[in-house]
């Protein structure tokens, strides 16, 4: 995962101080891109141990169109708890936009289902795109995430905003545009999540996984993560693991947690860091 370390080092060494919504402060750059060949291993960071269980359950939760943390909590995943209401609701975040985008006449669009059909029948299309950025439902920054949910808005605006697929010579590639990226805590999750999603969609459309391309807008290191960043940059990357997926699953909505097996994952110890809310 040298690509990830290069991103981290670039922002640490070349970023500029910038204030942010959380009040923590960041070192930030605007515009950066990484590329991962998924045939060369599963891109899970090895210079600190990552919690793959949370990544898989969150992705399945998105694909199921869910926006309440009950499923996550029932599976020991707490990564969304800080923004949810007392009843566990997060408003129309990723899952709702992926599976139930508001359309005309009160109807909704299932972007994921449409994407699968397009890849199968129009693989050369330049419209193989999923968007989670719905301006009408973005939260009001002057009130809390919970109050936004009560007003029918998202608890948080989507950070990983839009992704596009590309089919060439039987291989499926994906490019993600991420408008805002917490490099130390969030980006390892994002890389693994979209790499896995690409592999899943490739399987159900009869393709091989290609590249995952990760494009950033505001890529930042929080000021209270810089010590941890220095620690991680001193570590040497280990060989990438592989991800085995149950080959019997042919429906993108048919996957469950037990259909995934991470193999040969070696990682340096976890590095704790505070979350900026």
From Swiss-Prot:
Known pathway: Pyrimidine metabolism; dTTP biosynthesis
Transmembrane domains' residue ranges: none
Annotated GO MF terms: thymidylate synthase activity
Enzyme Commission number, as recorded: 2.1.1.45
Active site: 159
Binding-site residues for (6R)-5,10-methylene-5,6,7,8-tetrahydrofolate, renumbered to this chain: 51, 182, 276
Subcellular localization(s) per the UniProt record: Cytoplasm
Keywords: Cytoplasm, Methyltransferase, Nucleotide biosynthesis, Transferase
InterPro entries: Thymidate_synth/dCMP_Mease, Thymidate_synth/dCMP_Mease_dom, Thymidate_synth/dCMP_Mease_sf, Thymidylate_synthase
Catalytic activity: dUMP + (6R)-5,10-methylene-5,6,7,8-tetrahydrofolate = 7,8-dihydrofolate + dTMP
Highest taxon listed in the record's lineage: Bacteria
Positions bound to dUMP: 21, 126-127, 179-182, 190, 220-222
Cleaved signal peptide residues: none
Family statement: Belongs to the thymidylate synthase family. Bacterial-type ThyA subfamily.
Function: Catalyzes the reductive methylation of 2'-deoxyuridine-5'-monophosphate (dUMP) to 2'-deoxythymidine-5'-monophosphate (dTMP) while utilizing 5,10-methylenetetrahydrofolate (mTHF) as the methyl donor and reductant in the reaction, yielding dihydrofolate (DHF) as a by-product. This enzymatic reaction provides an intracellular de novo source of dTMP, an essential precursor for DNA biosynthesis.
Subunit structure as annotated in this protein's UniProt entry: Homodimer.
Protein name per Swiss-Prot or TrEMBL: Thymidylate synthase
Source organism: Teredinibacter turnerae (strain ATCC 39867 / T7901)
């Amino acid at each position: 995962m040298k690509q990830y370390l290069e991103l981290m080092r670039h922002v640490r060494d070349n970023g500029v101080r910038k204030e942010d919504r959380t009040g923590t402060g960041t070192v930030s750059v605007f515009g950066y891109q990484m590329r991962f060949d998924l045939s060369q291993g599963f891109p899970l960071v090895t210079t600190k141990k990552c919690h793959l269980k949370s990544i898989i359950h969150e992705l399945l939760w998105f694909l199921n169109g869910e926006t309440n943390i009950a499923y996550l909590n029932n599976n020991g995943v707490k990564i969304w708890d800080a923004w949810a209401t007392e009843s566990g609701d997060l408003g129309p975040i990723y899952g709702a936009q992926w599976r139930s985008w508001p359309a005309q006449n009160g109807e909704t669009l299932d972007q994921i289902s449409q994407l699968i059909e397009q890849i199968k029948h129009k693989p050369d299309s330049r419209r193989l795109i999923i968007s989670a950025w719905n301006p009408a439902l973005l939260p009001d920054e002057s009130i809390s995430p919970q109050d936004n949910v009560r007003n029918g808005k998202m608890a948080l605006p989507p950070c990983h905003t839009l992704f596009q697929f590309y089919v060439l010579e039987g291989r499926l590639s994906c490019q993600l545009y991420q408008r805002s990226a917490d490099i130390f805590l969030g980006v390892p999750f994002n890389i693994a999540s979209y790499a896995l999603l690409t592999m899943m969609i490739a399987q159900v459309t009869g393709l091989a996984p290609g590249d995952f391309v990760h494009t950033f807008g505001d890529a930042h290191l929080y000021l209270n993560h810089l010590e941890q960043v220095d620690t991680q940059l001193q570590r040497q990357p280990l060989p990438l693991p592989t991800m085995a997926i149950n080959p019997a699953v042919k429906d993108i909505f048919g996957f469950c947690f037990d259909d995934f097996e991470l193999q040969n994952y070696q990682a340096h110890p976890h590095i704790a860091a505070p979350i900026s809310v």
